[in-house]
């Protein structure tokens, strides 16, 4: 009888703990064939998740409601493009385009640029076109290493997050997080270079391991950090720069390395390195 009672108590405790978690699994990304690159940044458009990969070999497309793999959009690929974060803009390249442009940051030691993609067509037959490459200042000049972009569509700004020293996993030497603000360049075919003199604001924060996906909504920036066993999600107020809150992702329901972070409507989603898509219960 005691065992039965204990089992019931444990089951109730686990159920209540699950309810308390910030994120719950929605579905597992399962492409028709093996992924040609590790999952990185992603966005939600047209009731679909567009999942970018390291090396930019392709974009996998999933139904956000059913979890089905709908299509793999081939890209030319670039070994030094990391596709660490992706953001949906509010800009349409051509009149009649169904989907807005997508900005993807190629953060690593070799590349510090942002690629702007136009995705056209319909579900199951999307096509992707590289429209613009935005070059960021050299890290040593900009004062930010491993730069990631985050779009602020409400104010027409680009935020760049990264590190004050050349390491994403070592806090020694005063290494910490840097967040810069630039004005978003106009869209045009070809390349555009942002200069260090274009920096409009700079903010400093305490070190966190491995910058990952980030998104801005309603004046707040949300970013995930870390690896399996040491990860977090942080919310910042854009106007004041204040860190509003931070939560341990393992305790919040995501045990593996977080990668993508994006909104679909009012719902926040996170995709981990293994392709598990998590839905946020409550912000």
Labelled PLM ranges:
Residues 56-62, 109-118, 166-183, 229-235, ...:
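Structural motif
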Residues 47-79:
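Beta-propeller domains
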Residues 242-264:
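Conserved blade-ending motifs and adjacent loop-strand segments that build the rim/top face
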Residues 35-45, 82-99, 143-156, 164, ...:
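Structural signature of eukaryotic scaffold interfaces centered on beta-propeller domains
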Residues 67-107:
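Blade-loop segments of beta-propeller domains
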Residues 28-57:
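Beta-strand-rich domains and repeat architectures in extracellular enzymes and scaffolds
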């Amino acid at each position: 009888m005691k065992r039965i009672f204990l089992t019931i108590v444990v089951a109730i405790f686990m159920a209540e703990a699950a309810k308390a978690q910030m994120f719950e699994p929605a579905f597992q990304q399962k492409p028709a064939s093996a992924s040609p690159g590790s999952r990185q940044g992603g966005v939600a458009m047209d009731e679909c998740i567009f999942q970018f990969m390291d090396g930019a070999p392709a974009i996998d497309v999933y139904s956000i409601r059913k979890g089905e793999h709908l299509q793999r959009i081939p890209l030319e690929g670039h070994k030094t493009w990391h596709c660490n974060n992706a953001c949906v803009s509010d800009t349409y390249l051509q009149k009649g385009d169904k989907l807005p442009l997508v900005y993807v940051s190629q953060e690593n030691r070799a590349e510090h640029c942002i690629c702007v993609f136009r995705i056209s067509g319909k579900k199951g037959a999307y096509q992707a076109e590289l429209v613009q490459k935005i070059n960021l200042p050299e890290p040593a000049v900009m004062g930010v290493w491993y730069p990631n972009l985050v779009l602020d569509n409400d104010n027409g700004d680009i935020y760049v997050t990264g590190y004050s020293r050349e390491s994403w996993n070592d806090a020694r030497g005063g290494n910490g997080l840097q967040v810069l603000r630039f004005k978003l360049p106009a869209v045009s075919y070809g390349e555009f270079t942002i200069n260090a003199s274009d920096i409009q604001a700079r903010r400093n924060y305490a070190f966190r391991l491995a910058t990952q996906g980030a998104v801005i909504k309603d004046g707040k920036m949300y970013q995930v950090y870390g690896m399996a066993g040491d990860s977090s999600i942080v919310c910042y107020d854009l106007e004041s720069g204040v860190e509003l809150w931070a939560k341990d992702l393992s305790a919040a329901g995501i045990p593996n390395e977080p990668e993508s972070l994006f909104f679909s409507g009012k719902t926040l989603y996170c995709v981990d390195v293994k392709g598990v898509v998590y839905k946020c219960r409550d912000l």
